Amino acid sequence: MTELYEKSLRKLELDNVLAQLADCANSEDGKDRCRALLPLDDAEEIRLLQQQTTAACGMIVRKGAPGFHELKPVAASLERADRGGCLTPVELLRIAGVLRCIRNVKAYYSEDGEPTVLDVYFQELSPNRYLEEKITNSILSEEEIADAA
């Protein structure tokens, strides 16, 4: 980055703006992504992101905001499970929370019916209610596993 670019970011107080944006995010990963944002200079990319923002705002106005409050970081747990490692009850409950969130967000999207530039993101979501329920029925709390598990 050039000195002029960095000076412009300071003058615009981008770090303060991004901190305010991060305060609105529901997950730690979301907060981190907000703080890491940088201005774009590609007109097509800017146009697409503006269209996505408009579409998301329209959905929120019509239906309210989808809930992401259950999202906890699970990437490390999934990587360990993929390598054959064992997961703790806490990790399994977090994964169940992510699966529940995916199911709820997919249902949120399905209610709309209007095509938007966000469709590609919603279509990538794959709920797995069977696994979600298997986890929640088997793990009673962070320290208690059901006898039938």
Model-predicted regions and their roles:
Residues 1-148:
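Conserved amphipathic alpha-helical "coupling/scaffold" segments
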